[in-house]
Amino acid sequence: MKTCLFAIAALAVATSASVYTAHEAVAAEPKYYFQTQDVKAGPEVDAALKAYAMEALKADLAARPEWASDIGPGISARPGEDRSALAAELKKRNLRGFDVTVRIETFKKEMKDPKPGGRLKRLAMEMKVSVVGTTIPEAKLAFNGTGEAGIEAEVAEARLAADTANVGKEVIKDAIKQAVDQAVLKLSMPKSVPVNESRKKKKG
């Protein structure tokens, strides 16, 4: 399978995110706790792709030293359950907790004719995702990010199912990484002070 990968992202965001990631890599202790929640997607996205989207999100966040997903046995209550013990443990460890969800906003898949002179058909796949984080236990919106990616690959009829699955995984992984980079960058930025508040401080 020959693959041509392209990713659509704002250059400024990508550059800033890479700088941020390099800076945070030296952090010794995590600052955030996360739980991944069910992937949101339309009927055009099959269960296998949704399952991989959750795996990709979890793997991406777990690879970042400032994020943790395990703070001890029995302290991982899900939304709708009693999360008082989880909230207390997060406060004790000085961690900010978030429920993180992937939403697959758009998903397009198209089989194209072979290139001139070629024999293999081409599979084109595009996806746009958003990653949203809400606070634990308040469930208030804390951050979000978007990512968009696509792949066009030559596929053999005999391996169509396997090649389609692999293309889908690559698209999801790349789009989610973009979205998480953007979301984490926003989370790291200091909160802006309202204009009225800044004026009061100057007068004081």
Predicted regions and their residues:
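Positively charged n-region of N-terminal signal peptides that target proteins for export
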Residues: 1-7
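Bacterial N-terminal signal peptides
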Residues: 7-18
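A structural "domain/chain start" motif
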Residues: 17-76, 146-148, 156-157, 161, ...
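Short regulatory "switch" loops immediately downstream of catalytic or recognition motifs
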Residues: 65-69, 106-112, 153-155
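A short, well-structured beta->alpha microelement
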Residues: 70-90
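Surface-exposed short loop/turn segments
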Residues: 83-140
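Short secondary-structure boundary motifs at beta->alpha junctions and helix caps
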Residues: 118-186
